[in-house]
């Protein structure tokens, strides 16, 4: 319980994409704080529903498969008071208990594949994790296309 406004969690399989730009990312972190965001994800492998809230930012209802996240102070107590079990997949669990989640798209972070020791059963096939990110990317591109096609103001 310090004075941190945010904590960035970056797992060992994280790699920045060509979309990462330091100053732009910092602006997005600040902008999301104004929205009351509790977790900002740099990339995700799956999600339920998504709503564009601003250029390159989507609110999501739940998510899984992430390796880079910014956790805002407003989520600290909720996380610290949650009882995790050994079976919980932390990023997926956080996606369920924290309501105000946003993902940056195009993704600024993806998972590199290197032979995980902690991989979830079923995801051990080479290329599987990358496919999840590609599928999530395609879904978000579809939302972006609709916003542009119908000139929806964000």
What is the predicted role of each segment?
Residues 1-10, 14-154:
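An acidic/histidine-cluster motif and surrounding catalytic segment
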